[in-house]
Swiss-Prot record:
PANTHER family, alphabetized: LARGE RIBOSOMAL SUBUNIT PROTEIN UL30M, MITOCHONDRIAL RIBOSOMAL PROTEIN L30
Name of the protein in its database record: Large ribosomal subunit protein uL30
Gene: rpmD
GO molecular function terms attached to this record: structural constituent of ribosome
Keywords in alphabetical order: Ribonucleoprotein, Ribosomal protein
Biological processes per GO annotation: translation
Superkingdom of the organism of origin: Bacteria
């Protein structure tokens, strides 16, 4: 299964762990979209930054 992830909020003022989690997902700018395979690494990083991103499951 794949996930469509969109960065909805900026990283200004966020701690280092949240910035690294967003970068590891391949996101840099607000509004940027990536499509990734669902796996434990991706799910763990999404849990850390769920308030900054929008996630949609693709079939």
């Amino acid at each position: 299964m794949k996930l469509k992830i969109v960065l909805r909020r900026g990283l200004a003022g966020k701690d280092k762990a949240k910035k690294e989690a967003v970068r590891s997902l391949g996101l840099k700018k607000v509004g940027e979209t990536v499509i990734l395979e669902k796996n434990p690494m991706v799910c763990g990083n999404l849990e850390k930054v769920k308030h900054l991103v929008c996630v949609e499951e693709l079939s």
